[in-house]
Amino acid sequence: MRRLAFILAVLSTAAAISSNAAFSQQPTQTWITDVTIISPENLEHIAAGTMVIEDGHILRIDRSGPPPKPPAGVRVISGKGQYLIPGLIDSHVHLASVPGMNSDQQAGKSQMIEAYRRQLPRSYLYYGYTTVVDLAVFSQKVLQYVRQSPWHPDVYDCGESLPLANGYPMSFWPAEQRFKQFPNFIYDPAQAAKIPAEYKPEEHTPTADVARVKNSGGICVKIFFERGFADNFRLPVITPEMIAETRRAATQSNLVLFMHGNSFESQKFALAGNVDVIAHGMWHWKDRDRGLDRVLDNEPQLPAEIKSTLDQIAAAQIGYQPTIQVLEGERAYFEPEFLSSSDIAKVVPKELLDWFRSPEGRWFGNEINEDHLPAEQFRKIYDEGPIRRVRQATAYLAQKDANFVFGTDTPSGPTYGNLPGLNGYLEMQQLHNAGLSLTQIFKAATINNARKLKLDGQLGTIEPGKTANFLILSKSPLQTLDAYDSISTVFLHGKPIPRESLSATAVQ
């Protein structure tokens, strides 16, 4: 018996030694050689070089002198003729939302939704987004699902958002449900009679709400200034005192303050409140303070008072997310060829795409076109109205070298026009058409985002010590926008992933 035990021990030890030897033979470093390195903090020095990765981080970069010779036992990847850039950051996503569906449409479609959520993180990676930020967490369960997926971008979040009681976006829910859906709301004493008695004012101050975000692990806080939509512009909005308290609490907790605001009035309010990021472009030009109603909306060029506000936003280096695809995401229902794009099949499962094409799947288009206008007329209203205005405001900020931070608001609502990953590529096209240079877009999606999010110690550039999240492309993003669709390999924490393996068509 002792002899048998001894033999088993010897065999076990030998197996362990063999296993350790095999493990030790695995490459501990990856060398990417002869690749053109483009890093946003060093655009004056773009050159071919070698980058060494170890333990998921960039160990060193050699750009000058004779190329170093990789030692034996390391993994070597040739980057000859290709470009290496930081992984992209989308700082405005909503991971729990399913494009094209509200809660009613989701009923009875669990398998379809499960297939979508399996593909969701892969679709962001497919278009190079190695980091995303969820600005308003509706479901920690979905975020955990994404974080536990085999391949997924790094996920940060703002915790639960801070809507004003009964304001946007609480207003979309029935009165008896909205406080359960948005438990981190800001108490409004002026509406005390409309707030259930179980919610105590002292537990829903901006300070208390920000503390809950901090305790949940959030890196940012999201508030809203939205008077409404269409013919209903009577939603309650936060006061200067509320935003001032939120600003103080966010600063004390070292959290980034985002504010939803897509109007002239709201962006003046954001400027006065010293927010860190304005989450949306300016597609409404009304000035409620002066009672101008739709007069400014109809101005063919940027009015002087709007230019003045945009000048101050640019000078203050407030982060700015135009999110033009929010509007294009609605317009997509009136573009007959939109769902025929081969790009869409790469980011959503076939069963969901088939549903988008069904009469039921077009429900949202019918809802936003209440007057049943012809598609051409609907597109014209958008093109000559809010899309024109947001492009003009964005172009002006681009001329002023404003601090653009890239965010897409994916999906902005129950629309199939904002699909994960692809929506980022389409937003880049919108920004370029609006007047941003290729360099401005590149910086917005990398270093500007990293700095504003206080993640620049880890992300945003190609430098030693940074997380090895980066992309290999066949084209330079400083020369052509379609470089962002020329990705060959996505590196996630130092591990290479062939892009095509991330496509929805690759797993069906």
What are these model-derived regions, one by one?
Residues I37-T50, R63-P67, R388, L419, ...:
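Acidic, glycine-enriched loop/beta-strand segments at the rims
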Residues L43-I85:
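Histidine-rich, glycine-flanked metal-binding segment
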Residues Q82-R147, Y168-A175, S266-G273:
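Metal-associated gating/positioning segment near the N- to mid-region
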Residues N102-A115, W173-P174, F179-T207, F258:
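Active-site mouth loops of central-metabolism enzymes
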Residues R117-V142, H152-S161, G217-G228, L255-V256, ...:
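Divalent metal-dependent hydrolysis catalytic cores, especially in the metallo-beta-lactamase
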Residues S149-S161, P236-L255, I313:
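Alpha-helix-loop-beta-strand connector modules within alpha/beta enzyme cores
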Residues P196-N232, L271, V275, H284-A434, ...:
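Active-site neighborhoods of metal-dependent hydrolases
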Residues L426, L431, T467-V507:
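C-terminal cap of metal-dependent C-N hydrolases
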